[in-house]
Amino acid sequence: MALGLEDKKAIVAEVNEAAKGALSAVVADSRGVTVANMTGLRKAAREAGVYIRVVRNTLVKRAVAGTDFECLSDTFTGPTLIAFSSEHPGAAARLLKDFAKAQEKFEIKAAAFEGELIPAENIDRLAKLPTYEEALAQFMMTLKEASAGKFVRTLAALRDQKEAA
């Protein structure tokens, strides 16, 4: 069924809104993936706060024009699935990477973060970004280890001073 001009404008506006509020985007080719598996992916995406849409290439090019994701324009060939992460930059990359492991026909083309194009081979850089809570926990552990280490060194210096006396 052909889309009318108003339908196309609505799709471009919807994808553009998602792009403006997104932290990162991932582009993939979903040819050969069953409807049941795609439905499962969409459900997992909703739970992870990821916006997923299969869009015509000309429409998605217009939608991302003027956003941080314009660098992805060259990857819009063939059937295009685009996923935007709005809560955490690595959410879409992590979700699609895990899905690609289970579905051999699903292929990640590229990703974008802060206006930088990330090739499919380097998608791990984005997928392995810690969440805010994980980063905060790592920072607190670093502070805790630093203060504990300083305390141990102080005790060792005190012991050495008493032994020398």
Curated annotation (Swiss-Prot):
> In its UniProt record, which GO terms are filed under biological process?
translation
* CDD domains per the UniProt record, alphabetical: Ribosomal_L10
Q: MF terms per GO, please?
A: large ribosomal subunit rRNA binding; structural constituent of ribosome
Give a yes or no for keyword Hydrolase in this entry: no
**Keywords, comma-separated and alphabetical:** Ribonucleoprotein, Ribosomal protein, RNA-binding, rRNA-binding
Q: PROSITE patterns from the entry?
A: RIBOSOMAL_L10
Which cellular component appears as one GO term in the record? large ribosomal subunit
Q: Do you know which InterPro entries this protein is assigned to?
A: Ribosomal_uL10, Ribosomal_uL10-like_sf, Ribosomal_uL10_bac, Ribosomal_uL10_bac_type, Ribosomal_uL10_CS_bac
Pfam families assigned to the protein according to its UniProt record, in alphabetical order: Ribosomal_L10
Superkingdom of this entry's organism? Bacteria
Subunit composition and interactions? Part of the ribosomal stalk of the 50S ribosomal subunit. The N-terminus interacts with L11 and the large rRNA to form the base of the stalk. The C-terminus forms an elongated spine to which L12 dimers bind in a sequential fashion forming a multimeric L10(L12)X complex.
Family to which the UniProt record says this protein belongs: Belongs to the universal ribosomal protein uL10 family.
Q: Which NCBIfam families match?
A: PRK00099.1-1
Q: What does this protein do?
A: Forms part of the ribosomal stalk, playing a central role in the interaction of the ribosome with GTP-bound translation factors.
Report the protein name in the record: Large ribosomal subunit protein uL10
Which organism does this sequence originate in?
A: Shewanella pealeana (strain ATCC 700345 / ANG-SQ1)
Tell me what gene encodes this: rplJ
